[in-house]
Every structure is written in C-alpha cells, then in structure tokens.
UniProtKB/Swiss-Prot annotation:
Changes seen on gene knockout: RNAi-mediated knockdown causes the formation of misshapen heads as well as ectopic V6 postdeirids.
Record field: compositional bias (Pro residues): 1-10
Name of the encoding gene: ref-1
Effect of residue 24 to Q: In mu220; fails to downregulate lin-12 on the left of the E8 primordium. Nearly all embryos lack the characteristic intestinal twist
Compositionally biased residues, Basic residues: 356-367
GO MF, any single term: RNA polymerase II cis-regulatory region sequence-specific DNA binding
Species: Caenorhabditis elegans
Protein name stated in the entry: Regulator of fusion ref-1
Length: 367
C-alpha cells in the first residue's frame, strides 16, 4: 500500500481557485473603501475600479502638495480644508439643480477645472515629482477607452472579430489600466518615503491599498494640537479658505449665463449648510404653553353673551310653614274656596291698608 503524500490535482486546483477568489474579494473591498474616502473629491456617481485608482493617485498627489510631510502647518492645513469643503458643497448644489445628467456632468466638470486652476495659483510650492494628470487628459483617455470598447471591432477587410476576442481585449485593457494605477501608487509611496523601494517591490496590491488608505485618512485628520494658538490659527485659516472658495464659486456661476440666476440660491445653500438654522417661513418648534393662571375675571369664550351674576348673600328668612289655624273650623268640601290662609301677624294687619284687608278676606258661609 502506497501512501499519497501530495493532494490530488483536482483538490489543489480548487484550493488555488478559492484562494484567488478570496484575494480578489479582499482587493475589491479595499477599492470600495478607497472610493468612499475620495467620493467627495470625485464628480462621478458611478466609478469603475480603474477610475477609483486613478482618482486616488490624483488625491494623494494633491494632498501632499497642499500639506507636505507627515505634519501640517495649521495655516496651510486649515485654509485648504475650508477651501475643499466649499468646493464639495458647490458640486452638491449643481447636482441638486435637477438638470439633465449630461448638462449636470458638464457643469461639474467645468467647475472642477475652475477650482483646480485657482487652487494651483494659490499653492506656494508645487511638487515636480508628483505631477498629476489634468482633468482634460483623464476625460479624453476615458472617453477614448469607452469609444474603443463600445464601437464594433472590425478588421481592415471588414470581417467582424469574434465577440470572445473583443471581450478578451477589453479585459486586458482593464487590467493594464489598473496595473498602471497601482504602479503610480507605488511610485508615490517610494517618493514620499512611506516605505523603502525594496519593500515596495515585494508588496502586493492589497498592502498598497492599505498604505494609501491610511495615508488619506491621516492627511484628512492629521491636525491634532493642544496649543490654543495653533487651534486659533487653524480655525482662522478654515474661515479664510471658505471665504476664498466662495468667491471662486460665485465667479464660476457668474461666468455662465445659465447659472448666473442661481447665485442667490447658492449663497443661501452655503449659509444653511455651514450654519444650519430654521429659515423664515419654515415650521419651527411650538411655543411652550404658559402655566395656568387664575385671573380675576374668568375667560369668556363668547363675549357678547351676558355672564350670570353670582348670587348675593342675604339674611336667612324666618322659616314659617303655612298651617291650618287651630281655631278655624275644618275645611269645606267646596272646591271653589280654599281653606289655606296666609299667616299674618297682628302688627302686619294693623299697618296694612283696610281696603287690601277686605280684598284678602275670604268668604266663609259658616262664620
């Protein structure tokens, strides 16, 4: 009986395939995380992996130009942080106008070129090693790639190439573009001394993405200072950066005849986004009900109705129940005459009028 020391070929192939699939899934997850970090920097809603990697090269190059080195100057860092926030709000406002998608894309692209041109003029130092591709070159390359991939591939003789061959060429082109982007990210890591060249040569793509993601996160939140003076400088620089970017945004809107009518709306959008507060005419919190009070005069829901007067206090009357006189004879059976008399005192009879006494006297035939 011979023991097999090596696994069968089918099992080894399946294991290698599962490991390759796991590695691709991890790379795709890292690219998705990278896209979330640079989403505010982008002007496209849907981005391919090649677009994300190329945009990452642009973002890290610009970040290093704006705030070189691991530590940042509070004035420089605060200015470009405020500048970037207004730039992102401008793109969001353009997308919220509700225009056609092609028109919106054109507005955003022109606005980005306008901001990039003004930013480059504001930068005091420009890194010659990490020159990023301009937006026009990226747009031209992406459009040419899409036109080549979307157009039917034909040979010189006019015979249509097999669809499998076209699909294979597209996949190879996609891999080449991703490879170029990864090479650019590795060169950035070496130039900025994030790692040595020997380490980068043996580095896999997953490690490259981890380093770039950590770099972007550190650059976005790298200003931590306990000094009150530096915090004050940073806050003042943010305000100046926002002010400068607002002026640039208004200049861009005034340069277009379709956007010039939206300048007032843009100003309100900036005001509400930077310092949100309830605007006039919008529903606000209800006024709290005051505690109940007891006024002298009660509340009258219908003032034209007379209010009932409170009963006045009077002295109690002497309770004198009418009764039959003991000296009077029993009542008569005749129903026409009443035998009940109103009791009266002698003083009252003496003071009363004699005519009234005659009228009040009842006729009794038995008297």
């Amino acid at each position: 009986m011979v023991l097999i020391s090596t696994p069968p070929p089918a099992y080894a192939h399946n294991r290698k395939t599962s490991q390759e699939k796991k590695r691709r899934d991890e790379i795709n997850a890292k690219i998705k995380e990278l896209q979330l970090l640079i989403q505010n920097e982008s002007d496209n809603e849907k981005m391919t992996q090649g677009d994300v990697l190329n945009r990452a090269v642009e973002v890290v190059s610009r970040m290093e130009t704006e705030s070189p080195g691991p530590s940042s100057n509070p004035n420089r860092k605060g200015f470009f942080d405020g500048f970037r926030s207004i730039e992102s709000l401008t793109y969001s406002f353009i997308k919220s106008l509700g225009v056609n998608s092609d028109v919106c894309q054109d507005f955003v692209q022109r606005a980005k070129q306008f901001f990039d041109r003004e930013r480059s003029s504001l930068l005091s130092t420009v890194s010659g090693k990490s020159k990023r591709r301009s937006e026009s070159e990226i747009l031209h390359s992406s459009m040419s790639y899409r036109s080549q991939s979307s157009s039917p591939s034909t040979s010189e003789s006019g015979i249509t190439i097999d669809r499998k061959e076209v699909k294979k060429n597209r996949e190879q082109d996609r891999r080449d573009r991703q490879g170029e982007a990864f090479d650019a990210l590795k060169n950035f890591i070496i130039e900025n001394k994030l790692m040595t060249s020997h380490q980068v040569e043996k580095m896999q793509r997953l490690n490259t993405l981890d380093i770039i993601i950590a770099y972007i996160q550190n650059k976005k939140h790298n200003f931590v200072s306990r000094s009150d003076q530096e915090q004050s400088l940073y806050a003042h620089a943010i305000a100046e950066g926002k002010k400068t970017a607002k002026n640039i945004a208004f200049q861009f809107f005034k340069s277009d005849r379709h956007l010039v009518v939206r300048c007032a709306d843009l100003e309100k959008f900036f005001e509400f986004s930077l310092s949100p507060k309830p605007l006039f005419g919008f529903p606000s919190m209800p006024i709290p009900i005051p505690p109940p009070s007891f006024p002298i005069f009660p509340f009258r829901p219908f003032p034209f109705f007379p209010m009932p007067m409170a009963p006045m206090a009077t002295s109690p009357k002497s309770q004198q129940s009418p009764s039959y006189s003991l000296d009077s004879p029993p009542p008569s059976s005749d129903t026409s005459s009443s035998s009940i008399e109103t009791p009266s005192t002698p003083n009252e009879n003496s003071n009363s009028n004699p005519k009234a006494s005659r009228k009040s006297k009842l006729f009794r035939p038995w008297e």
